[in-house]
From Swiss-Prot:
Organism: Escherichia coli O1:K1 / APEC
Protein name (database record): D-galactonate dehydratase
Binding residues annotated for Mg(2+), in chain numbering: D183, E209, E235
Misc: Reaction proceeds via an anti dehydration.
Annotated site (Transition state stabilizer): E310
Pathway, per record: Carbohydrate acid metabolism; D-galactonate degradation; D-glyceraldehyde 3-phosphate and pyruvate from D-galactonate: step 1/3
Site (Increases basicity of active site His): D258
EC number: 4.2.1.6
Length: 382
């Protein structure tokens, strides 16, 4: 079997799908994208295709190493996202050829279900509370919400009080009937992270995500030393080499590699194993589409330390398409009591509606994250 063609499709709301075709008619799908940089990743995919056309798709490990090591410059969000989507598609092909789901090819199940959590938007506490109530009706009891709006490098007590007030009202409204993580989104400087984490501790969030930017990872162990709240990070780390430094330094309790950013299934399985050796749990980052989610689920079901799975159903970014709009076998992604079951169809287990993908790709928007500014008009982290 040989790879004959690689096609990319930019899609709403902010996704990109990839299709790998073979001379035997077996097709694999992947999801390579950096949100807001889809065209750049698309160019990288087609540059990497020179290494792939005419090659045997079953040699996933060799092809991964070629894509990573053949170029003198490597790593980073763009190249690793391109590799990630290609890697997902190669695993999809292998599973279809062998008539087995990817988790079966990786040694079989380590669990029968995985807890999912849902992102909750809203600028006011009442809006967040209403959103949680709606999601509880469909089975969720675990959530993630923004921990704050933009904060200055050193900000005032009013900004801190506003962030804490939202969390306090949520805990008061639901008590211990729900769990929630707080996403700082890298918006918070190290000095302000110290202040905010201390103020939030009485409300017992499940975790705090990206307490500071990955570029400031040296602060993770320092922040962890002052709190009992587990710290989470990883969506802006792109290879096992990035994660190696964080694991060695300590401070992070939950790793969040993104299966569409950090080298795909091949790389993230290695990252999961590294984390387990440090007694660090895994909660793959996934605010993206169905192929990315499927890839995450296969890792969850073969990784002992996987504890939570993010998913983008109903997320506020999903304008123009929802999580399962391009999927034929929607029922396979159904959750029971807030848990996903293993996908059982061969490969990734996602049946893509290719005709719909082609149609929607004709007018795909170029999504960009907002540009925020502080009161003094300097740029703020989003």
């Amino acid at each position: 079997m040989k790879i004959t063609k690689i096609t990319t499709y930019r899609l709403p709301p902010r996704w990109m799908f990839l299709k790998i075709e073979t001379d035997e008619g077996v097709v694999g799908w992947g999801e390579p994208v950096i949100e807001g940089r889809a065209r750049t990743v698309e160019a990288a995919v087609h540059e990497l295709s020179d290494y792939l056309i005419g090659q045997d798709p079953s040699r996933i490990n060799d092809l991964w190493q070629v894509m990573y090591r053949a170029g003198f410059y490597r790593g980073g969000p763009i190249l690793m996202s391109a590799i990630a989507g290609i890697d997902q598609a190669l695993w999809d092909i292998k599973g279809k050829v062998l008539n087995a789901p990817v988790w079966q090819l990786m040694g079989g199940l380590v669990r029968d279900k995985i807890k999912a959590y849902s992102w909750v938007g809203g600028d006011r506490p009442a809006d967040v509370i209403d959103g949680i109530k709606t999601l509880r009706e469909i089975g969720f009891d675990t959530f993630k919400l923004n921990g704050c709006e933009e904060l200055g490098l050193i900000d005032n007590s009013r900004a801190v009080d506003a962030a804490v007030n939202t969390v306090a009202q949520i805990r008061e409204a639901f008590g211990n009937q729900i769990e929630f993580g707080l996403d700082f989104h890298g918006r918070v400087s190290a000095p302000m992270a110290k202040v905010l984490i201390k103020e939030l501790e009485p409300y017992r969030p499940l975790f705090i995500e990206e307490p500071v930017l990955a570029e400031q990872a040296e602060y993770y162990p320092k922040l962890a030393a002052q709190t009992h709240i587990p710290l989470a990070a990883g969506e802006r780390m792109f290879s096992r080499f990035d994660f190696k430094r964080v694991l060695e330094a300590g401070g992070i309790s939950i790793l969040q590699p993104d299966l569409s950013h950090a080298g795909g299934i091949t790389e993230c399985y290695k990252i999961a194993g590294m984390a387990e050796a440090y007694d660090v749990t895994l909660a793959p980052h996934c605010p993206l589409g169905p192929i990315a989610l499927a890839a995450c689920l296969h890792i969850d079901f073969v990784s002992y330390n996987a504890v939570l799975q993010e998913q983008s159903m109903g997320i506020h970014y999903n304008k123009g398409a929802e999580l399962l709009d391009f999927v034929k076998n929607k029922e396979d992604f159904s959750m029971v009591g807030g848990f996903f079951k293993p996908l059982t169809k061969p490969g990734l287990g996602v049946e893509i509606d290719e005709a719909k993908v082609i149609e929607f790709s004709k007018n795909a928007p170029d999504w960009r994250n907002p540009l925020w500014r502080h009161e003094d008009n300097s740029v703020a982290e989003w």
